[in-house]
A protein has these predicted regions:
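OB-fold and OB-like single-stranded nucleic-acid-recognition modules
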Residues: 9-111
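Bacterial N-terminal signal peptides
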Residues: 1-5
Length: 111
């Protein structure tokens, strides 16, 4: 069990690496479908609504995508549905459900 845990940790990128890579990769929701799993991205748009648990609906005005925002990150963000936001995270592809974004940073965009 410990070996599996260490191996899984070795494959995961640290948040600071994701932030560096995403700073150079501003994309639209429609472009995400063409990206590989674990690609670091930055998105700007509107947080539409909280769906359940860590899942939120996001739109960049062109397309919609699900955001997976951990509870501790969400509580610290002071963001609510309808806010314009900038999201930094990783593309998370799945075999049997739609692609989403695993969020490592979210901040409100002031108008």
């Amino acid at each position: 069990m410990t070996t599996l845990s260490l191996a899984a940790g070795a494959w995961a990128k640290d948040d600071h690496i994701i932030l560096q890579e995403a700073a150079k990769n501003h994309v639209s929701v429609s472009a995400i479908a063409k990206l590989k799993d674990e690609t670091a991205v930055t998105l700007k748009g509107i947080l539409l609504k909280h769906l359940n648990e860590d899942n939120y609906e996001f739109s960049d005005g062109i397309g919609d995508i699900l955001l997976d925002i951990d509870d501790d990150l969400w509580k610290a963000s002071n963001i609510k549905a309808g806010d314009k936001v900038q999201v930094v995270g990783e593309v998370d592809t799945h075999r049997y459900k739609p692609t989403d974004i695993e969020v490592v940073k979210i901040e409100k965009v002031l108008k």
